[in-house]
């Protein structure tokens, strides 16, 4: 059996993928992968996702230069969620979020509202030309 066949893909052939920073263990982002994206990620050693809005493979960093080097690919106990242990490149500290922040999880719920807790490290207008 092919290793990709052991996974439980959803009805659209997709699976959520969490990118976690190697070393700090910060959760950087959640994206989606199809079989081809996961296969390319394993082959290339860099994160390749599937863009649901563009309906195509998304090579992380192809526009921004903020590539994710993949050190390890894990699967959860139900075999329906992927975890990538990555090094975020292209800026120090690494920028994973399209808003110019280190992580896409930069808002925290406090006292009935969402508060921004993490700074913008680079203006998104200068990231995406």
Swiss-Prot record:
Gene3D superfamilies: Phosphoribosyl-AMP cyclohydrolase
Main subcellular location: cytoplasm
Cited NCBIfam families: PRK00051.1
Residues that coordinate or bind Mg(2+): 76, 78, 80
Functional note: Catalyzes the hydrolysis of the adenine ring of phosphoribosyl-AMP.
Subunit structure comment from the entry: Homodimer.
Cofactor: Mg(2+); Zn(2+)
GO cellular-component term (any): cytoplasm
Protein name: Phosphoribosyl-AMP cyclohydrolase
Keyword Lyase found: no
EC number annotated for this UniProt entry: 3.5.4.19
One function term, GO molecular function aspect: phosphoribosyl-AMP cyclohydrolase activity
Pathway membership, UniProt: Amino-acid biosynthesis; L-histidine biosynthesis; L-histidine from 5-phospho-alpha-D-ribose 1-diphosphate: step 3/9
GO biological process, one term: L-histidine biosynthetic process
PANTHER family the record matches: HISTIDINE BIOSYNTHESIS BIFUNCTIONAL PROTEIN, HISTIDINE BIOSYNTHESIS BIFUNCTIONAL PROTEIN HIS7
UniProt entry keywords in alphabetical sequence: Amino-acid biosynthesis, Cytoplasm, Histidine biosynthesis, Hydrolase, Magnesium, Metal-binding, Zinc
Compartments it resides in: Cytoplasm
Lineage of origin: Bacteria, Pseudomonadati, Pseudomonadota, Betaproteobacteria, Burkholderiales
Superkingdom, natural source: Bacteria
Reactions mediated catalytically: 1-(5-phospho-beta-D-ribosyl)-5'-AMP + H2O = 1-(5-phospho-beta-D-ribosyl)-5-[(5-phospho-beta-D-ribosylamino)methylideneamino]imidazole-4-carboxamide
